[in-house]
C-alpha cells in the first residue's frame, strides 16, 4: 500500500473510532472525580426524588439512602432546626439540606468556606424538585450554617 493511501486508511480508522466512542452514553465521559452526593430521604418522598434527578443532571454522582429516622440524620449532620427541610445530603464533608440548586452546591465546593453546610429551609415552590407548572417560583434564601447553629444568607433566588 502506498504511503498516501496508508495515511488515508489510518485517518478513516481514527474517525470511525472517535465516532464510535461518541455514541456511548454521556456517563462514559463523566469525570472520575465527579463529586458523590449521599442523599438521606424518606422512602415516600417524591420531591426528594425530583431533587436527586436535578443534581444528577448537573453531573453529580448520587447515592440515595432511604431512612425512616431523618431527625437523627439531620442532627448528625449539624443541620439547625431553623434550616431543616425534607432531605439531607452530604457532599465532600458538607451538609446540603433541602432543595438547594446544583449550581449553588458547585459554588460551595469551589469556594470551600469554613461552614458545616448550606440549606434551603422548608420547601419553596420553584426550588429544584419543587417546581409547580403554571405557578411562579417563590423567592428564597440559601442559608449557610456552622456547627453551633449560626446561619447566614449564602445566596438568594
Where would I find each of the regions flagged by the language model?
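N-terminal secretory signal peptides that target proteins for export/translocation
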Residues: 1-4
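Bacterial N-terminal signal peptides
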Residues: 7-17
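Stable alpha-helical elements in mature extracytoplasmic
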Residues: 44, 51, 66-69, 101-105
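Loop/turn elements at helix/coil->beta-strand transitions in domains of secreted/extracellular proteins
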Residues: 34, 60-61, 114-116
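Conserved helix-turn-beta segment immediately C-terminal to the redox Cys motif
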Residues: 52-72
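Boundary at the C-terminal end of the N-terminal hydrophobic targeting segment
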Residues: 20-24
